[in-house]
Amino acid sequence: MRLAKYLAQCGIGSRREACRLIEARRITLNGKIAKHTDPIRLDSSLNCLDSIELDGAPITQTETLAYWIFNKAVGTDCRLLEQDETSVIHLLPKAPRLYPVGRLDKDSRGLLLLTNNGELTHKLMHPSFAHSKTYHVRLDRPFTDEFVEQMASGVNYKDVQTLPCQARRLSSDSFEIVLTQGLNRQIRRMSSALGYKVIDLQRVALMTLTLGSLAEGAMRPLTPQEVAVLKAAVTI
């Protein structure tokens, strides 16, 4: 098994995050700085036979897999930065160890999935899987029906052409949009390219998972049914 995949299974983060840790030379394998190509040895019971450390602390195989939903408020940073007082890391429970699946901009709010399941994170994050995310957006002024049609058809900005998506009006200055892309600040840049400024952006759903009555700033474990539906949707 490749090192990055094993680290993800241990709940360190997604495979992408595991690769960043390896590139930053923060992972050691049997006392030596680890490389991406390093294999991990497992016994017949799938127990690791190697000594792996992150910043000098031993990495053990993952605790029980956990799945939480968080209603992020504006001002909370999704990056796990101990030195940043606005980081979500200061809001997470001590156990189980959780990390965000993807990100919401610091100036956006709404649904954020937290887990220690690296395989699930990989399938939700990788663009080839194209899972839907639903947002409610309020602009700085009322917009036309043509704006909604343009958003749904795809918008070109900075040599980027966004894919067609679903969009519908909610009010004179608010709309709902369902994306399967995950470009950086995509909705804000699409709106800006059409002459509008986003005043409020809230993620309200990730596939079938919704916020429901969860208060802003609160988090809770997913129900067994929610976990089952989520796993079925990503085929794990």
Where are these regions (language model features)?
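Basic, flexible Lys/Arg- and Gly-enriched helix-loop patches that mediate nucleic-acid binding at interfaces
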Residues: 1-236
